[in-house]
C-alpha cells in the first residue's frame, strides 16, 4: 500500500478481535524475543490476509509441507554496477539463481495455478503431478522429503498434496516447527486464500510502449508490419461484429460481464441505439489513443511464470545438486504456442533491455508433465530470470510469437547482458511503536518509481531513438536506482551517484517527456513533451490511423419493447414520480463523488445501488413498473444518448426481460451478428461465407496452439 500512497487503518477493538488470526499465533513480543525483524516487512506480511482474496474452501493444511528452496549455479556474463562509484564492469562469473523463489506446487487433479495468501505465506502455486512423477522416476525409498525444520515426510503415506518452499513462508524462523504453525493455523481460524487464478481462456494481449521503445533501430517497414493488426482492429470497430463485441467485452469468455455487455450478447440489435453508438465512438477513440501510446494488439498472452518443476523434483527427491530438468538453456514451455515457435518473453516494468527470445519446446514429454497449466516454464540452466528481473511468486510474462518483433528484439539484444548490482538487506531489530512510525513515514517519503521510469523513457527516445553507449549506461544506472527505490520501504536505503555521473544522467533527463506521452500518459502537448522525433515509439504513434466509424448493416432493427416486462404497465409522463426522480438523480449524482480513482469499477458503484433503491421507494411502484417506465421514456420520448444510469441501476432486470423476450427469436450468426432462420439444428452460421470464416479462425487457433498431448494420446 505504501507504493500506491494508500493507508489502511483498523479500529483497535476490531483489530484485536482478529489479531491472532492475522498473525497465526505470533505476537510482537514473541517476534522480539527471537531478535525482531524489519518493521515494514512485518506490516507488509501482516496485510497478506487483508488483500482481496477468495477463500480456498478445500485447502487442507495437513496435506501441506514446506521445503527448502532450490538454487542453481549458472555461469554467465553480466554487467556489474558498483553502487559506490557507479562503475560498470562486464564479468563472467557463477551466478546463483533462486529457481523457486516464491513458488510451490500442488498435485491435486483439477487444481488451477493461482497466487495464494495465508498468514505469513505468499506466492504462486502451480499444478504439477509430483506423485505421478515419483512413481515413474523414483524408487519408493526416495518418496520422502525433509521439511525446513528437519522433519521427514512420506509423500504418499502422509497424503501430501501441496509442497511450498521456504521463500513463500516469510516468518518461518519464528516458529519452532511446521507442526506448531499448523496447530496455530487451526486454533485461530486461519485459512488459505487466492487472489488471482489462471483463467480457462487467456485472450490475446497488447504490448506497451516500454517494451517497444527498447527496440531503437526498428525500420519503417517493421513498424508497418507490427501495427498492422492494430490498424485493422481500429478500422473494424463498428463495422465488424466480432471485433466490436470483443472490444466491448461482450464475449462468452468474459466471466464478469456488465449488464450492458450481457445484453449485447443476447440482443445485438442494441447496437442500433444512439447510446451504444456513442459507446462505440468512444471505444474507437480510446483505441486510437491507446495505440498511439504504444498499446498494440499482438500475438501474445500474459502467462504466469513457473520454474521447471521436473528439475525441482530431481533436486528435492533424487538429491541431484545439478539436475537436468525437462528444459535446456534457451528453451521455454507453454501450451499456448506450438513446438519450435520463437517466443519473446517480456515483463513489466520493462526498464533496461528485457527481451528474452527463447524457443518453445513442446513434445509428448513436456506436454505430459507441464501441459496441465497455461504457465510459461523457464529452464533452470537459463539466466532468463535475471534478464526479466523476476521471481516466481506470481509474476506474469507477456509471451509473444511475432516474427517481426523477435527479429528486431534479437538484433537489439546483441551485446546486451543482464545487469547485476548489490542491494542492501532490510534492517532488522526490535519492533516498537517508534520503529513502526519511523519505518512507515520514511517509506512514504522515500521516493516514487514513476519519475525514474519516465526518465528512462526520456533517455531511450533521445537522439531520435539512436542508442549510444553512454545512453545504455545511463539506462543501466537508472534501472539500478529504480530497484533501490522499490526496496526502499524495506531497506530505507538508496545510493547517490558521484557528481560526474549525476551530470551525465541529468544531460538526458532534464528534457521534457517524449512526444508520444501525449497519448500514453495524457501529458499536455504544449508544455510537457518534446517535439516528435524519429524514435521508434514516436514513429509508431505517427503511423496509427484515425478513420471514421462505420456501422454493421447486418444487425437487425432495435425493438425497444424487448427490454421490458410485457405483462406490466408503464408510464412516460415526465411529471410521474418515476421519471421525475430519475431526472433529479441525473443532475444530482455528483453527491456520490469518488474522485478519479482508477481502481473503482464505475458499473458496480455503491451509488447506483442507492439511486435505484431511492427511485423505487420514491415512486412507490413495483420494480418492473419502474424499469418499464424508464426504458419506454429513454428509448421513445427522450431518446437519450446517455443511458449509463439506467443500465447501471436496472441493467440486470433489463437483461432478464431480454432473456424472456428473445427466447423465440431466430439465432444470431456469431460471425456477422445477423439473425437467420436455420435449415436445421446443425446450422450455426447464416451463410457459407461466415462458415468459411469461422472454419479459418478455428484452423488458425489450432495451428498456433495444438492441443496438449496427454493420457491416451501419448500411447498412439
Language-model features, listed with the residues they occupy:
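Beta-strand-enriched accessory nucleic-acid recognition/scaffold domains that flank the catalytic cores
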Residues: 1-389, 395-396, 402-674, 679, ...
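Cys/His-rich microdomains that often coordinate metals
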Residues: 676-677, 690, 694
Amino acid at each position: 500500500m505504501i507504493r500506491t500512497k494508500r493507508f489502511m487503518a483498523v479500529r483497535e477493538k476490531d483489530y484485536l478481535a482478529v489479531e491472532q488470526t492475522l498473525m497465526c499465533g505470533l505476537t510482537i513480543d514473541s517476534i522480539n524475543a527471537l531478535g525482531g525483524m524489519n518493521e515494514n516487512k512485518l506490516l507488509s506480511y501482516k496485510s497478506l490476509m487483508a488483500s482481496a482474496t477468495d477463500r480456498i474452501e478445500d485447502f487442507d493444511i495437513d496435506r501441506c509441507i514446506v521445503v527448502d528452496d532450490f538454487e542453481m549455479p549458472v555461469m554467465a556474463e553480466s554487467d556489474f554496477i558498483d553502487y559506490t562509484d557507479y562503475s560498470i564492469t562486464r564479468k563472467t562469473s557463477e551466478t546463483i539463481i533462486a529457481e523457486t523463489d516464491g513458488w510451490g506446487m500442488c498435485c491435486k487433479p483439477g487444481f488451477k495455478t493461482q497466487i495464494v495468501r495465508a498468514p505469513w505465506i505468499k506466492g504462486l502455486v502451480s499444478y504439477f503431478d509430483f506423485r505421478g512423477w515419483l512413481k515413474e522416476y523414483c524408487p519408493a525409498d526416495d518418496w520422502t522429503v525433509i521439511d525446513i525444520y528437519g522433519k521427514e515426510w512420506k509423500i504418499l503415506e502422509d497424503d501430501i498434496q501441496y509442497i511450498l518452499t521456504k521463500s513463500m513462508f516469510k516468518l518461518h524462523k519464528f516458529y519452532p516447527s511446521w507442526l506448531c504453525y499448523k496447530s496455530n493455523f487451526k486454533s485461530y481460524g486461519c485459512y488459505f486464500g487466492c487472489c488471482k487464478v489462471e483463467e480457462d481462456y487467456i485472450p490475446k494481449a497488447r504490448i506497451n510502449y516500454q517494451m517497444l521503445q527498447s527496440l531503437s533501430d526498428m525500420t519503417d517497414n517493421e513498424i508497418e508490419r507490427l501495427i498492422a493488426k492494430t490498424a485493422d482492429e481500429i478500422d473494424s470497430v463498428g463495422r465488424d461484429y466480432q471485433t466490436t463485441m470483443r472490444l466491448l467485452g461482450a464475449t462468452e469468455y468474459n466471466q464478469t460481464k456488465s449488464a450492458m455487455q450481457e445484453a449485447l450478447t443476447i440482443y445485438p440489435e442494441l447496437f442500433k441505439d444512439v447510446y451504444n453508438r456513442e459507446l462505440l465512438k468512444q471505444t474507437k477513440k480510446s483505441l486510437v489513443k491507446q495505440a498511439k501510446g504504444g498499446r498494440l494488439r499482438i500475438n501474445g498472452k500474459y502467462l504466469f511464470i513457473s520454474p521447471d518443476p521436473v528439475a525441482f523434483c530431481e533436486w528435492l527427491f533424487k538429491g541431484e545438486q545439478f539436475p537436468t530438468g525437462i528444459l535446456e538453456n534457451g528453451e521455454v514451455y507453454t501450451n499456448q504456442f506450438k513446438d519450435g515457435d520463437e517466443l519473446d518473453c517480456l515483463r513489466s516494468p520493462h526498464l533496461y533491455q528485457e527481451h528474452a527470445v527463447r524457443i518453445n519446446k513442446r513434445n509428448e514429454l513436456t506436454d505430459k508433465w507441464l501441459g496441465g497449466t497455461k504457465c510459461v516454464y523457464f529452464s533452470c540452466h537459463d539466466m532468463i530470470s535475471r534478464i526479466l528481473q523476476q521471481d516466481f511468486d506470481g509474476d506474469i510474462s507477456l509471451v509473444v510469437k511475432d516474427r517481426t518483433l523477435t527479429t528486431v528484439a534479437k538484433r537489439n539484444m546483441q551485446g546486451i547482458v543482464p545487469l547485476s548490482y548489490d542491494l542492501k538487506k532490510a534492517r532488522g531489530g526490535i519492533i516498537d511503536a517508534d520503529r513502526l512510525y519511523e519505518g512507515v513515514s520514511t517509506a512514504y517519503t522515500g521516493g516514487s518509481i514513476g519519475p525514474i521510469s519516465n526518465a528512462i523513457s526520456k533517455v531511450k527516445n533521445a537522439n531520435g531513438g539512436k542508442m549510444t553507449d553512454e545512453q545504455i549506461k545511463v539506462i543501466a544506472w537508472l534501472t539500478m536506482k529504480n530497484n533501490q527505490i522499490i526496496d526502499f520501504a524495506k531497506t530505507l536505503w538508496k545510493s547517490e551517484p558521484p557528481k560526474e555521473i549525476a551530470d551525465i544522467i541529468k544531460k538526458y533527463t532534464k528534457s521534457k517527456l517524449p512526444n508520444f506521452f501525449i497519448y500514453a500518459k495524457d501529458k499536455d502537448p504544449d508544455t510537457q513533451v518534446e517535439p516528435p522525433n524519429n524514435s521508434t515509439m514516436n514513429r509508431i504513434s505517427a503511423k496509427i490511423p484515425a478513420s471514421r466509424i462505420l456501422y454493421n448493416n447486418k444487425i437487425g432493427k432495435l425493438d425497444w419493447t424487448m427490454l421490458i416486462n410485457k405483462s406490466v404497465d408503464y408510464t412516460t409522463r415526465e411529471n410521474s414520480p418515476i421519471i421525475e426522480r430519475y431526472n433529479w438523480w441525473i443532475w444530482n449524482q455528483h453527491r456520490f463523488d469518488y474522485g478519479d480513482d482508477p481502481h473503482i469499477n464505475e458499473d458496480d458503484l455503491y451509488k447506483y445501488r442507492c439511486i435505484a433503491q431511492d427511485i423505487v421507494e420514491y415512486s412507490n411502484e413495483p420494480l418492473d413498473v419502474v424499469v418499464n417506465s424508464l426504458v419506454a421514456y429513454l428509448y421513445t420520448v427522450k431518446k437519450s444518448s446517455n443511458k449509463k444510469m439506467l443500465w447501471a441501476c436496472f441493467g440486470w432486470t433489463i437483461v432478464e426481460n431480454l432473456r424472456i423476450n428473445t427466447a423465440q427469436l431466430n439465432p444470431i450468426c456469431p460471425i456477422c451478428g445477423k439473425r437467420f432462420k436455420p435449415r436445421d439444428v446443425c446450422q450455426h452460421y447464416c451463410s457459407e461465407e461466415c462458415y468459411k470464416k469461422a472454419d479459418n479462425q478455428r484452423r488458425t487457433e489450432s495451428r498456433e496452439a495444438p492441443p496438449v498431448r496427454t493420457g491416451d494420446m501419448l500411447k498412439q
